Amino acid sequence: MNYINNKRILTHSALVLAMLGSLVGCGSDSDDTTTPSTTKPPQLSPAVGVKMTGSCSDLLGFQYNNTVISSATLQETGTLTVANKPIGAHCLVKGYMDQRVSPVDGQTYQIGFEMRLPVDWNGRFLYQGNGGTDGNLIPATGQVGSGGPLTNALHDGFAVISSDAGHNASQNPMFGLDPQARINYGYGAITKLTPMAKNLIKTAYGKLPDRSYAGGTSNGGRHAMIAATRLGDQYDGILASTLGFHLPRAAAAQLYTAQQLRRVATDENDLSTALTLSERKVLAKAILDRCDALDGVADGLVQDVEACRTAFDIHQHVPVCSSTRDGTCLSTEQIDVLANIYRGPVNSAGQALYATQPFDPGLVGSNWASWKFESSVGTARDPVAVGILFQVPPDPTVVQNSRQFAFNYNFDTDYLKLSATNDVYTESSMSFMMPPDELNLDKLRNHGGKMIVVQGTADGVFSVDDTQNWYDQLLQHYKNDAKGTAPEFARFFRVPGMNHTRDGIATDQFDALTALVNWVEYGQAPDKIIATARGAGNPSGQVNTELPQDWAPDRSRPLCPYPLIARYNGQGDSEKAENFSCK
């Protein structure tokens, strides 16, 4: 990452800012009850780096409430690498907080963590939110939100913390039987670890972090949203990538997907038989035929998501099989099933229970297929999350019958268990997993904080429409607010074709953290973020083998702040971002 004081200045366009501002109308719906003020939030100053004081072993003596430091060791330069580049020398500190024995299941729980503190520190702290059901201590490198990263926060001098969110791998998914473990997974871990981590930083460097960031992908993006809403005055920058901040609803939607796919699967034990790769390619081509050129160039990407909603109709624009399925067409029932999946789950009264999804050719990606065909019925993902972690009361037998649990899930009765409570489980998953008020970002905004949200349009589990709906409401909530409209402190970027967190048919390699730092500390609002395809020879060493052969291996595109999209300028190499503009 190169920040502005290191000679990289992000392009700033007053025109685009004006366009973004005009999109939010007039009047104010802010719930801020303080005395109205025309004073804008302050511009935060850049972080100032310092060297570590003392040695790593000194940190073994760190004292904090209910915290145990179990090890503190020096990691020499090159112990870790990113994109074949050495990460500098740093202290690796491991420990845990709040060890206890559950009165419900008798298990011993604790919030395990590791912190990596650079010897040569840049003055910044990053809370790394991790994905899935947590339970593992993912190395605290600060790799957030992109395919094949070329750098990470630790490489660039951040102090980074990572945690297991209050349970270990052997307790997955049965930690859902313990009410406090549920809460720690939802929001307890980040709220407890944040002040501890800052105090450990002060011990290591003689000062608190100048700037604090929270970032993560998938469930880690949800953790970042929790930081934005519950801890907005403790963080200066939020990077929420592929965020599942309505995770209980999204997980239940996966069960609906499984039920729909079962209708057309030739083998219910292999849901990929419901829609083969050849058949997914038929659908992708139909989408591209109607929507590819809407952004000014036919390039295999659908940038104009909104226009495509009107231009493409799955009931009208997909070849229909006249007899048996042969991979060149879709049956009428397959089309109905896909229409239902992309509409999202409903109950018997027709009430929408999650969000729609846009049709995108990225559905040919194996990442998309894995979430739809495997995770929707598997023992490690959605059924166990719904049945053990999110519903009240939990049902531990789901581990043994996850497929049948998904197939038999009742969206009238079972879905209500996501918001249920009882004497043991006094907080529902709709409370502990989701932000308390997802539209109130006053604490973040009012002290000068900023937020970047990124999501792929072909995500196989968390709908980009769900995130977009939230952002549309945020635009309305802060419209014409004297303290700052939404685009002045929070921006949402869609990644066309990208599957869950990465992959798909997409330019999925980008550096949103640098963009966030330059916005927070230097006032340079991100009018675009350049994204690159990971074709042959990509310097990350992580090649996306599913990219079309007619793409340049280093194809680039600007990711645009919603509602703007990347449009071809009409001339120049269409493989290069420089020939596209956000309009």
PLM segments and residue spans:
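C-terminal motif of bacterial Sec signal peptides marking the signal peptidase cleavage site
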Residues: 21-25
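Cap/lid segment of the alpha/beta-hydrolase catalytic domain
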Residues: 122, 130-206, 252-253, 403-433, ...
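Gly/Ala-rich beta-loop-alpha elbow adjacent to hydrolase catalytic centers
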Residues: 216-220, 224, 459
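A catalytic-pocket lid/entrance helix-loop region that shapes and gates access to the active site
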Residues: 226-228, 233-348, 494
